[in-house]
């Protein structure tokens, strides 16, 4: 028997790389679930705390099925030019968030709007601002902050449409675009500025002659996302650069401790309008899942795309690499697919969105940057290629379909490694989702041969893409941070 000396170290049995990776994955999953439980417990504790009398007096709780405060926009005594634009946009009746928020906003009050994506919240803050702008017609009248570039462009489109008969000038300031071009746009004295926090701060610090000392309206859209992306320090700087005497709107999907602190720092005696504070999915959304083997995940995806030929589809992946690789795979196999993720240039991202919205491409493969706030109409199917890490992200994803009263379908591809997380999502949304049947094994095996061959080529092309991207970005320093 070998004797181990006092200075020797006893060696542990060796594990295979596969077991190490599996153990690490299980550890990460356990930690994520533990953190989720802690966050949920903290949220419940915060919700159970009594609210101050001042806050209670100003809270207006609204459910989507509640009777609206006004049934037509003509009841609001808006200027004719704004009413004409609203009619051109075919806004037949106000949504609950519009019904509750707009009357308070027209009275000049600060607003906290708690509403999910697709609730009509952009118009809820744009209409009061444009109504007030008609009376003033001053430059740099309103500033809207958004956490993501695409969302900023979507907000600009809404302001452009609502202000089309009023001569409203808007500018969108986001990272990835030329600073000098944006500075020239600012010198044209736009009425409304829509921006990501990092880029507007760049201009406040470096663009000669530009300031927001005359600003009248300040909007933080998707404020929870702004804070999740750690824009807090930049927001503090912006708040110091704008007048304290202003009207402020804060819109968020959820009310967190961070939002409470931001509200206290930036709003004065606000009215809080809450449409829905729970994680809910639309009643007209058909949700289901498919249990798939991890090695056959791409094959199941292609099978589904064959089943939904001609439909408008959004596929959600967890990472930029998955998104790029899956879009290449789909194109190799003959599908009209475009990617949307943070490694694309701004022009490429806008190009993908425009192709999808126009119908030139019927499949959009995206990271969660596309899940919130973007105006993508008439999506028939949402496929969760990768299961999201929490129920909130799941609800935001599947909320891209079944909007404005239309029906929709969502399918989640669940591997053995995703099952525990998926069960947590079911528990949170309080729905047991049906399991879709798998295709016949012979059909799946035959399809797998073609998919596997295409996947190998997709991996090669994805590596080339990322190498080219790294070379192109070397030396650049973009201060804007956003979820990719």
From Swiss-Prot:
It is found in: Nucleus. It holds the Pfam family DEAD. A motif (DEAD box) lies at residues 221-224. Residues 1-61, 460-484 are annotated as: Disordered. ATP-dependent rRNA helicase required for pre-ribosomal RNA processing. Involved in the maturation of the 35S-pre-rRNA and to its cleavage to mature 18S rRNA. Keywords: ATP-binding, Helicase, Hydrolase, Nucleotide-binding, Nucleus, Ribosome biogenesis, RNA-binding, rRNA processing. It comes from Scheffersomyces stipitis (strain ATCC 58785 / CBS 6054 / NBRC 10063 / NRRL Y-11545) (Yeast). Transmembrane segments: none annotated. This is ATP-dependent rRNA helicase RRP3. Belongs to the DEAD box helicase family. DDX47/RRP3 subfamily.
């Amino acid at each position: 028997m070998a004797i181990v000396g006092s200075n020797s170290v006893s060696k542990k049995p060796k594990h295979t790389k596969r077991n190490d990776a599996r153990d690490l994955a299980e550890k990460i999953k356990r930690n994520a679930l533990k953190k989720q439980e802690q966050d949920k417990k903290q949220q419940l504790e915060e919700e159970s705390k009594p609210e101050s009398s001042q806050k209670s007096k100003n809270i207006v709780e609204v459910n989507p099925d509640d009777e609206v405060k006004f049934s037509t926009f003509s009841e609001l005594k808006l200027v004719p030019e704004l009413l004409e634009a609203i009619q051109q946009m075919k806004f037949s009746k106000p949504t609950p968030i519009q019904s509750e928020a707009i009357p308070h906003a027209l009275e000049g009050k600060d607003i906290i709007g708690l509403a999910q994506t697709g609730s009509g919240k952009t118009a809820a803050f744009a209409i009061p601002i444009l109504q007030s702008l008609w009376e003033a017609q001053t430059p740099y009248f309103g500033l809207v902050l958004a956490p993501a570039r695409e969302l900023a462009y979507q907000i600009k489109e809404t302001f452009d449409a609502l202000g089309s008969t009023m001569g409203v000038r808007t500018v969108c300031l986001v990272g990835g675009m030329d600073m000098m071009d944006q500075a020239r746009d600012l010198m044209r004295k736009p009425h409304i500025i829509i921006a990501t926090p990092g880029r507007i701060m760049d201009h406040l610090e470096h663009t000669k002659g530009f300031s927001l000392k005359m600003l009248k309206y300040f909007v933080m859209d998707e404020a929870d996302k702004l804070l999740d992306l750690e824009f807090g320090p930049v927001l503090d700087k912006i708040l110091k650069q704008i007048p304290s005497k202003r009207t402020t709107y804060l819109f968020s999907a959820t009310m967190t401790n961070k939002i409470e602190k931001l509200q206290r720092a930036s709003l004065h005696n606000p009215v809080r309008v809450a449409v829905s504070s729970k994680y809910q999915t639309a009643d007209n959304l058909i949700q289901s899942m498919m249990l798939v083997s991890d090695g056959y995940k791409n094959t199941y995806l292609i099978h589904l795309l064959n089943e939904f030929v001609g439909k408008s589809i959004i596929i959600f992946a967890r990472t930029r690499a998955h998104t790029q690789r899956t879009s290449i795979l789909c194109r190799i196999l003959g599908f009209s697919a475009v990617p949307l993720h943070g490694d694309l240039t701004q022009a490429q991202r806008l190009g993908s969105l425009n192709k999808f919205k126009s119908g030139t491409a019927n499949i959009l493969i995206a990271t969660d940057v596309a899940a919130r706030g973007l105006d993508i109409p008439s999506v028939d199917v949402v496929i969760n290629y990768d299961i999201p890490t929490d129920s909130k992200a799941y609800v935001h994803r599947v909320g891209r379909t079944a909007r404005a009263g239309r029906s929709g379908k969502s399918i989640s591809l669940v591997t053995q490694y995703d099952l525990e997380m998926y069960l947590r999502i079911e528990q949170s949304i309080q729905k047991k989702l049906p399991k879709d049947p798998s295709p016949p094994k012979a059909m799946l095996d035959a399809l797998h041969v073609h998919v596997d061959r295409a996947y190998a080529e997709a991996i090669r092309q994805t590596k080339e893409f990322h190498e080219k991207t790294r070379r192109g970005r070397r030396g650049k320093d973009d201060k804007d941070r956003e979820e990719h």
